[in-house]
Amino acid sequence: MLEKIVENRHLSFEEAYDLFNILKEESEVRIAAYLAALQTKGYTSEEIAGFAKAMRDNAIKLDLGEVLDTAGTGGDKSFTINVSTASALILSEYTKVAKHGNVSVTSRSGSANLLEALGINIKISPEKAKEMIEKVNFTFIFAPMYHPALKRIMPVRKELGIKTIFNILGPLANPANPAYQVVGVNSRDLVEKMARALNYLGVKRATVVHGSGLDEISPEKETIVAEVNRGDIDFYTVTPEDFGLARTKVIPCYSPEESAERIRAVLRGNGKNEDRNFVLINSAMALYTIGIASDLKEGVELAENVLGEKIIKKLEEIACLSKS
């Protein structure tokens, strides 16, 4: 299979699935060769989906029923607050959310970093994850605890020091097999590929977004969207005005502690307007994606409705339950 990749020929879904299972047993040299060759060739939606499906199938099993996940690939180098995690907390007031994530990739606060700064225990067992979904509609799936098949691959990936297919697989590798997803990507070229990969994985409804350089919906500029609905894919663009909001700038974030402080302020209802809009538009898209909001403006209203004492109390419940 390595020769095929070096010759710039694409793999089928099945071949990509098999390749992941080969890599987990390969030597470091051959793992590096495969990853570098695949990165040089570029990967298709079938290859992305094949790897993601193999990651899910090799992961520790986690049956949580129909859940939503909101996640981004990272890698946009924008150093924003962790919007997808803030949105996940808001969304847990309306639906079951299983947030799959890790420590920071390129931002200053990955989902795991933020949740720890908010006082939430991220290193929980599958049994605890199920209990949290049932009791508070939210759980965090800390990726390193659920993907033992990556044990040999990850050190090689780190040693290589270049981007590989694993840089974009995180949002697709949730072992809870979410029925609904909002996926942010760091390149407009990835929007269609990730949408088609989600189709291969059998998602019910999903949106893939790229916001003018952000792996989120931009509160300032145009965002490209691929909407996946039971096999169909529609492509369109949205702006903050479509959400009924004025355009606001993205304020950089410099640490998990700062991200937690600013997000907590948004959840309390007294955060900076720029942070508030950023969180609201991304929450609104997720509420629209799962069918709770009929349009984006209603999504903003629903997200706004839970800000304040209600969501702060919920955050405390999540933190307490995660440690019990």
From Swiss-Prot:
UniProt organism field: Pyrococcus furiosus (strain ATCC 43587 / DSM 3638 / JCM 8422 / Vc1)
Question: Is Glycosyltransferase among this UniProt entry's keywords?
Answer: yes
Looking at its record, which EC class is this enzyme?
transferase
Q: How does it assemble?
A: Homodimer.
Q: How is the cofactor bound?
A: Binds 2 magnesium ions per monomer.
* One GO molecular-function entry: anthranilate phosphoribosyltransferase activity
Keyword Metal-binding present in the record's keywords: the answer is yes
**Reactions mediated catalytically:** N-(5-phospho-beta-D-ribosyl)anthranilate + diphosphate = 5-phospho-alpha-D-ribose 1-diphosphate + anthranilate
Q: Which residues bind Mg(2+) 2?
A: 215-216
Q: Which PANTHER family match?
A: ANTHRANILATE PHOSPHORIBOSYLTRANSFERASE (PTHR43285:SF2)
Q: What does this protein do?
A: Catalyzes the transfer of the phosphoribosyl group of 5-phosphorylribose-1-pyrophosphate (PRPP) to anthranilate to yield N-(5'-phosphoribosyl)-anthranilate (PRA).
Where does the chain bind anthranilate 2?
157
One Pfam family of this protein, by short name?
Glycos_trans_3N
User: What are the EC numbers?
Assistant: 2.4.2.18
Entry's Gene Ontology cellular component terms: cytosol
Q: Which residues bind Mg(2+) 1?
A: 84, 216
Annotated Gene3D superfamilies: Nucleoside phosphorylase/phosphoribosyltransferase catalytic domain, Transferase, Pyrimidine Nucleoside Phosphorylase, Chain C
InterPro entries membership: Anthranilate_Pribosyl_Tfrase, Glycosyl_Trfase_fam3, Glycosyl_Trfase_fam3_N_dom, Glycosyl_Trfase_fam3_N_dom_sf, Nuc_phospho_transferase
**Name used for this protein in its record:** Anthranilate phosphoribosyltransferase
